[in-house]
């Protein structure tokens, strides 16, 4: 029987190295995906996840088990990504890699690939706040409520951000005469 992540987190917060190892094995890929979609650069995402892995044992003592561990972890990753972007002043290049995974998966279909490339470029032009919201709602398929919990926002704020994303993407497409 598998131990729930919340229980593992509480155990790891109390210094249990085996619980910490199990948490990393279970959630490393999730941390990387969120970091990559938030930062857009493979090297930045790898560095960020390594930093998080180093600081996570200390941070786990603040996890109280009131929410799902995954929601708490999303917030840790998003906040660490924000800190890194502020520290590096890299907001202009923060999403260069958005959509690379999707582009690679659809390389066989030229028309789809062209549309995906356009979307990746358009995503890179969104504000970091909108990108991180899209990364959770579309990339991680979270509900607006769950994304709000992870970002420290209300469900309504997440819905508003997603509405803004649609509006900005539509405007970009119209500006580039992609919509007829």
Predicted regions and their residues:
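Short, Lys/Arg-enriched C-terminal cap helix and immediately downstream tail that follows
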Residues: 64, 86-89, 126, 131, ...
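Internal acidic/polar
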Residues: 2-5, 83, 91-116
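DNA-recognition helix of helix-turn-helix
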Residues: 78, 82, 130, 139, ...
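Short helix-capping/turn signature of helix-turn-helix
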Residues: 26-29, 37-40, 135-143
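N-terminal module of bacterial RNA polymerase sigma factors
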Residues: 1-30, 37, 121, 171, ...
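Sigma70-family region 2
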Residues: 13-14, 37-40, 51-68, 87-89
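C-terminal edge and immediately downstream basic/flexible tail or linker adjoining helix-turn-helix-like DNA-binding
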Residues: 11, 93-96, 121, 149-152, ...
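Arg/Lys-rich amphipathic alpha helix in sigma70-family domain 2
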Residues: 58-65, 75-96, 112, 164
